[in-house]
Amino acid sequence: MTLAPGRRLGRLALSAAACVALGVVQRDIALERPIDAAVQTSNSASSDALEVLAVRPPNVFMIAGAGGNIAVQIGEDGVVVVDAGSTASAPAVLAAIKRISPKPIRYIIDTGPDADHVGGNEALSKAGDTFFPGTRPAGPRPDPTRAVATILAAEGVALHMSASGSASTGSPAGLPTDTFHYARKYLYLNGEPIEVLHQPAAHTDSDVFAFFRRSDVVVAGDILDTRHFPVIDSERGGSIDGEIAALNRLAELAVPSVPIVSREAGTIVIPGHGRLCDHFDVIEYRDMITIVRDRVRDLVTSGRSLEQVKAAAPAAGYAGRYGNAGGDWTTDQFVEAVYRSLAKEKP
């Protein structure tokens, strides 16, 4: 039976993977135990519950509930973590990672500069161990005897996190120690290639996808957020057209399970927040944003003011699913971000 687009990975998460309590994350359980009743566990380090989900057992896992979603890849070389969660959740995240694998954390890959993704950088890095003895904690007085895990990110992440950047979202010891400004950075760890793909001017100017090629898992960061309309952070270089371009790239990377439709096959996409996704979920999200963008563009072209654009309700038909009347990112804020992004392009 073919599932409706937008619900495929919701079902997959309930049938193909295992969500287990932090105290019992074991490879055999991850492979055999169904996730029909997801188990959440609280811990003394955080009042929030964490969920550990086996995305591609026995190699790729996801930790939810620590701020942004966290991906964990394990193997003989050690542990690779994509995003580190919030500062407050770091002790609980470390405990979860240790129960997934006793190997040291080797790399932390930041998908962007937001505090709920990079806040745990310092704690996770200091708990890890690099392949390169010369790598030391950042900051004015690093411990010269202590090696740490490498923090890899696009160059803009370090700028936004530092005091000299446009926003300060982390301590000096949590700053990236390995940055790049080109389109693609790659690693080969735990038996598979890992591509880190820069997506300029999307959610911010320093977003990346982390693509685990053999596992066929893409970590999308906040370019894809299934909870609401995407956050277009224009102050940090984000734009609506860059967001759509990044989603087009993500749709190209995420191969659907065709012609044989299977809930167990196809590329899995880990969003910045929310449930696991697949190719069709990305397409649905991209199409929704494109339609709203085109509606706003027509209004901008006709000379409408921001208030007139908001009154025209260009997100109608989608606000019920992705909208928010209050909170951190409202429908009005999204429409305003799209308007301001397009107004910059207007001749």
How should these model regions be labeled?
Residues 2-14:
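Bacterial N-terminal signal peptides that target proteins for export
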Residues 14-15, 19-77:
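Zn-dependent metallo-beta-lactamase
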Residues 23-29, 33-41, 130, 256-266, ...:
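Accessory terminal helices/loops
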Residues 51-99, 208-221:
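Conserved beta-strand hairpin/beta-sheet module of binuclear metal-dependent hydrolase folds
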Residues 59, 73, 83, 97, ...:
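Divalent metal-coordination and catalytic microenvironments
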Residues 76-80, 87-141, 147-149:
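Active-site metal-binding motif and surrounding structural segment of the metallo-beta-lactamase
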Residues 78-79, 86-88, 143-199, 204-205, 213-214, 246, ...:
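Metallo-beta-lactamase
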